[in-house]
Amino acid sequence: MKRPVTGKDLMIVNMGPHHPSMHGVLRLIVTLDGEDVVDCEPILGYLHRGMEKIAENRAIIQYLPYVTRWDYLATMFTEAITVNGPEQLGNIQVPKRASYIRVIMLELSRIASHLLWLGPFMADIGAQTPFFYIFREREFVYDLFEAATGMRMMHNFFRIGGIAADLPYGWIDKCLDFCDYFLTEVVEYQKLITRNPIFLERVEGVGIIGGEEAINWGLSGPMLRASGIPWDLRKVDRYESYDEFEWEIQWQKQGDSLARYLVRLSEMTESIKIIQQALEGLPGGPYENLESRSFDRKRNPEWNDFDYRFISKKPSPTFELSKQELYVRVEAPKGELGIFLIGDQSGFPWRWKIRPPGFINLQILPELVKRMKLADIMTILGSIDIIMGEVDR
């Protein structure tokens, strides 16, 4: 980083990587002129674990537990993108029931991610009370995850061709009760937060991004939709069963931190609508496509035995990825999560490139904080919503 040539004495401040508002091990080298930000340089890589290289040395079923460590607050989306790629390469059809359950889990994960963004974001700008209310609702979502998958986080629930297990008895009623309860709580958030004059002073007009600027920077998710671009991959790509439900893209025109807050708050309400429709119209039938377990009998006859595949239900590492390349993407809570996958007729991917939304969205931070106050850095960084496990991979 070059020191700006000015006649004033500037101060260089290190924020992070242990600062509580960095939301992980992010380090910012901030150049200050008094309280005004002159320059900001993000330093990444403290949580780099070589996730792409690990993928190239694992079968897909072996790699699934790893992907939940990317964005560890929205693990259903990392699992979804990991199984969607091989499903498209192998032309594997997912049963309708499994697709509906996937949608339910994805939207619950979106709500949990937005809640865990909202609580610390409010704490960053000085509002402590909403933090505890928001974490109470998040616990209810995690209770639903634990009942269905056995894990509160790192669920390992998605499988190639379906899901790991069907929904347990009574889970649907419990989830519907949560939906009714949560809609009333969103109204409480609006009363407590959205109309609070102190909150509005901190976020209104701070970190403004125009629509064309957002596109040029490659932003996605709430960052893009808050800048006046109604772009949502659930509507554009129509993956899973999203085109069978009625819901609206939530977007704002202002492009500031307040607009990004409003988009995420409205998205939680839309997610509840999708979950309610999916639960009420949940079809019967199988929850996995057993044909996805079919392999080359000549090469590995013991892995195709009835006892191995259907009695013990052991996943075989011989699922071959056909020799072609593919880009798959989903609308994660933070934006467009994608993978570029190249198969070479073997059990391991030849190339596995991750497109993390948090990494792309973080690139605009230095532009947003220049000429702002030091205290606005926390507001702007919090409104971007990053998880360093996904940024560093």
Curated annotation (Swiss-Prot):
The keyword NADP is assigned to this record: yes
SUPFAM superfamilies: HydB/Nqo4-like (SSF56762)
Record membrane topology: Peripheral membrane protein
Alphabetized UniProt keyword annotations: Chloroplast, Membrane, NAD, NADP, Plastid, Plastoquinone, Quinone, Thylakoid, Translocase, Transport
Pfam families assigned: Complex1_49kDa (PF00346)
Enzyme Commission designation: 7.1.1.-
GO-annotated biological processes: photosynthesis, light reaction
InterPro entries recorded: NADH_Q_OxRdtase_suD, NADH_UbQ_OxRdtase_49kDa_CS, NDH1_su_D/H, NiFe-Hase_large
First-listed, main subcellular location of the protein, grouped into a coarse class: plastid
Catalytic reaction annotation: a plastoquinone + NADH + (n+1) H(+)(in) = a plastoquinol + NAD(+) + n H(+)(out); a plastoquinone + NADPH + (n+1) H(+)(in) = a plastoquinol + NADP(+) + n H(+)(out)
Entry function: NDH shuttles electrons from NAD(P)H:plastoquinone, via FMN and iron-sulfur (Fe-S) centers, to quinones in the photosynthetic chain and possibly in a chloroplast respiratory chain. The immediate electron acceptor for the enzyme in this species is believed to be plastoquinone. Couples the redox reaction to proton translocation, and thus conserves the redox energy in a proton gradient.
PANTHER family (alphabetical): NADH DEHYDROGENASE [UBIQUINONE] IRON-SULFUR PROTEIN 2, MITOCHONDRIAL, NADH-UBIQUINONE OXIDOREDUCTASE 49 KDA SUBUNIT
HAMAP family: NDH1_NuoD
Family: Belongs to the complex I 49 kDa subunit family.
Assembly and oligomerization: NDH is composed of at least 16 different subunits, 5 of which are encoded in the nucleus.
Full protein name: NAD(P)H-quinone oxidoreductase subunit H, chloroplastic
Name of the coding gene: ndhH
